[in-house]
Amino acid sequence: MLEDDIDMCLLDGSTYKNISFLSTGQRCTVILPIILSHSNKVIIVDQPEDHIDNAFITSTLIKSLKNNKNNQIIFSTHNPNIPVLGEAINIIHLESDGVNGYVKASGSLYDEEIIDSISTVMEGGKDAFVKRAEFYRVES
């Protein structure tokens, strides 16, 4: 009897590397899009930005989210690209008093309270956001 065997690899430059030789972040870039595109269950993802970079989030993860509008995917994240570019339907801003967690704000991406939460907590405040926007203005 032959056993099934799946060999997952990541194209790194011009070389395919087996998943067993990859870093945690590289493993996430291989597995996360597969999970998101082939599951019809509720998926909970806890802080993916801990192991993957913003380039992967904006180029691959967001695309996977937009292709899976029928699945319920719950993210715990500090990265504003995930709810904003992923066009989250519901956002819950959690806070803690040091003992207990509680919901500070909940609503759609376009609710003022949610916009304020995203800009303050995830972006570092409106001043930080404006400074980054000014920094990225590159003359061509």
Feature roles, as predicted:
Residues V45-E49, D53:
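Walker B catalytic motif
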Residues I6-C9, I43, A55:
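C-terminal amphipathic alpha-helical interaction region
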Residues L11, I35-S37, N67:
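Phosphate-binding P-loop
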Residues G13-T15, R27, S37, E49-D50, ...:
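Short, glycine-/Ser/Thr-/acidic-enriched flexible segments
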Residues K17-I19, V30-P33, K63-S64, N79-P80:
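Generic recognition of flexible, low-complexity loop/linker segments
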Residues M1-L11, T15-F21:
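Structural flexibility/helix-modulation signal
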Residues T24-V45:
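GG-anchored amphipathic helix commonly corresponding to the ABC/SMC/Rad50 NBD signature/C-loop
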Residues T58-S140:
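C-terminal lobe/lid and adjacent interdomain/linker elements of RecA-like ASCE P-loop ATPase modules
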